C-alpha cells in the first residue's frame, strides 16, 4: 500500500518505506527496519520512523527491502550493438538500478554510447571497454576477424577520456564466431596489455577459446580480474576431464580472481554449477548478461537469476550480497551504491518472495523445478519511486 500527501507540505522525507524486512549485506543487516529518503539519498534507517514526516509512504509489510541491485554484466547499447536492449525497462524497472555494460562499445563507439545511452538513461550505467575498437556491432563479423581490431593504443586513449565510467577492459575469446584463427589468443594478451597500462582489470569471456583449456586463460589473470560466464558448459570451462573443478580455478580464486555468473543465452549450465558448488566453488558476483537474445528467456532479468541461486541453496543474504555489497566494492562505489546506509544514493528495491512452483531453465535447455521466486514489486531510484506495484 502506498500513500502520497500534498506536495506543497514541508516534509522531512520525500519517501518512507516502512514495515519491511531490510536486507543490507554491506552492514550485515537482516531485520525489520524503516528506510527514509530525501534529496536523492538515504537519510535515516530505524525500527520506526514518523509517517507524518513523509511525502510518500510505502508499506512493505511481509516483503524484503534491499539496496538497488548491481548487475555487472549486461548489454545496453541498442541500435548499435546487435546485443543491445533498452536499459530502463529491462534493467531498472526490474530492480537493477546500476549496471555495467560488458563490452558492447569499443574505442570507436564509446563516445556515442556515452552521449546517446548512458547520459539519457535513468539506469546508472558503467562500462567495460571492449579491446575490439568497434565493440560488439554485428553477428556477421567477429570482434577479432582481424587481430588488428584489438587496438591497445585506442583502448587506452578512450579509457583516459572516460575514466569516470570505464571500469576495465573486456575481451571475448570464442573461436570462429568471435575470434578468427589468425587472431588466436592475441586479443587476450592485448586486453591484458591495455588493462595493465591503464591500471584497470580485465573481464574475460572464456568459452571455446583458441587454447587447450581454461588453464591457459587463468594464468594471465590477476587479483580483481573478472572471469565471467564461469558456469558455462562449453570448452575452456571450469570442470576438468575427470568431472572435477580444475586446480587452476582454485588457484585463481585464492589469488583474487573474481568468478562472475554472466548467465546469458549460452553460458549457464545446471550440471556445471551444481558440480562446482558441491566442491565449495561459489560465484563472487551474480550477473545476468542480459541482452536481446535472452531477455525473453531463459534469463528474463537479474531477479530470475537470483531465484536460481536460491534454488541452489544460497540464502537470501548470500544471494543479495552478490548483487549489492560485493559488486559495489568491485566498482569502487561501496559508500554510494549497494547499501542503504544513511548518506548512500537512494536506490532500493522491494521484493516479494513468492512460494510457488517455477521452472528454472539454464542456457542449454535443461530445467530445474523451484519452489520459491523473487519478484521485484517496487523500484526506487535516487530516492523516488520509479515503478511501484504496491500503489493504492
What are these regions (language model features)?
Residues 59-120:
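Metal-associated gating/positioning segment near the N- to mid-region
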Residues 3-66:
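Histidine-rich, glycine-flanked metal-binding segment
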Residues 174-276, 281-296:
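Active-site core of metal-dependent hydrolases
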Residues 20, 35, 40, 62, ...:
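Divalent metal-coordination and catalytic microenvironments
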Residues 94-100, 104-105, 120-147, 170-173, ...:
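Metal-cofactor-binding active-site regions of metalloenzymes
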Residues 20, 345-391:
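C-terminal cap of metal-dependent C-N hydrolases
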Residues 271-353:
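His/Asp/Glu-enriched, well-ordered alpha-helical/loop segment
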Residues 68-74, 99-101, 125-129, 167-171, ...:
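Hydrophobic faces of well-ordered beta-strands that scaffold small-molecule active sites
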Amino acid at each position: 500500500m502506498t500513500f502520497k500527501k500534498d506536495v506543497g507540505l514541508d516534509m522531512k522525507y520525500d519517501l518512507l518505506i516502512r514495515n519491511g524486512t531490510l536486507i543490507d549485506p554491506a552492514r550485515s543487516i537482516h531485520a525489520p527496519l524503516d528506510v527514509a529518503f530525501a534529496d536523492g539519498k538515504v537519510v535515516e534507517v530505524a525500527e520506526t520512523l514518523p509517517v507524518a514526516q513523509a511525502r510518500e509512504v510505502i508499506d512493505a509489510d511481509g516483503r524484503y527491502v534491499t539496496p538497488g541491485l548491481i548487475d555487472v554484466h549486461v548489454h545496453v547499447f541498442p541500435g548499435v550493438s546487435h546485443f543491445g536492449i533498452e536499459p530502463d525497462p529491462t534493467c531498472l524497472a526490474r530492480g537493477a538500478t546500476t549496471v555495467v555494460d560488458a563490452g558492447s562499445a569499443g574505442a570507436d563507439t564509446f563516445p556515442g554510447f556515452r552521449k546517446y545511452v548512458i547520459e539519457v538513461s535513468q539506469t546508472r550505467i558503467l562500462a567495460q571497454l571492449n579491446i575490439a575498437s568497434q565493440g560488439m556491432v554485428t553477428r556477421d563479423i567477429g570482434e577479432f576477424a582481424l587481430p588488428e581490431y584489438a587496438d591497445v593504443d585506442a583502448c587506452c586513449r578512450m579509457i583516459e577520456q572516460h575514466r569516470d565510467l570505464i571500469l576495465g577492459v573486456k575481451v571475448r575469446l570464442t573461436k570462429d564466431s568471435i575470434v578468427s584463427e589468425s587472431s588466436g589468443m592475441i586479443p587476450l594478451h592485448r586486453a591484458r596489455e591495455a588493462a595493465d597500462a591503464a591500471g584497470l582489470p580485465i573481464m574475460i569471456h572464456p568459452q571455446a577459446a583458441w587454447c587447450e583449456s581454461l588453464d591457459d586463460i587463468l594464468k594471465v589473470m590477476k587479483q580483481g580480474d573478472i572471469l565471467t560466464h564461469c558456469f558455462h558448459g562449453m570448452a575452456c570451462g571450469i570442470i576438468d576431464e575427470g568431472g572435477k573443478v580444475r586446480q587452476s580455478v582454485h588457484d585463481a580464486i585464492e589469488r583474487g580472481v573474481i568468478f562472475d555468473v554472466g548467465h546469458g543465452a549460452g553460458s549457464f549450465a545446471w550440471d556445471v554449477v551444481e558440480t562446482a558448488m558441491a566442491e565449495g566453488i561459489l560465484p563472487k558476483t551474480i550477473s545476468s548478461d542480459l541482452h536481446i537474445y535472452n531477455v525473453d528467456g531463459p534469463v528474463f532479468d537479474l531477479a530470475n537469476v537470483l531465484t536460481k541461486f536460491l534454488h541452489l541453496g544460497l540464502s537470501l543474504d548470500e544471494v543479495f550480497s552478490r548483487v549489492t555489497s560485493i559488486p559495489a566494492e568491485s566498482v569502487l562505489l561501496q559508500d554510494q551504491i549497494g547499501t542503504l546506509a544513511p548518506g548512500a544514493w537512494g536506490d532500493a528495491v522491494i521484493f516479494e518472495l513468492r512460494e510457488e512452483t517455477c521452472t528454472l531453465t539454464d542456457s542449454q535447455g535443461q530445467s530445474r523445478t523451484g519452489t520459491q521466486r523473487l519478484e521485484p514489486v517496487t523500484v526506487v531510484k535516487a530516492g523516488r519511486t520509479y515503478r511501484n506495484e504496491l500503489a493504492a
